[in-house]
């Protein structure tokens, strides 16, 4: 999985209320995760949102995985 997600994900309070987004877009990590969960393929997402590519989707997954690990550490 993409370990360099930091170069693709930004958090800015002025964009989408501070939700993590793909740099240069208003597309949230949670949007990408929802599309994947609904059954969309990487290719379908990239066709529907040409500003995204496979690296962006992998970065969103890596960000979510990293966030899950942080939550586990804090909860422990």
Short names for language-model regions:
Residues 1-3, 46:
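A generic structural signal for short, solvent-exposed coil/turn residues
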Residues 3-40:
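A short, structured beta-strand/loop element
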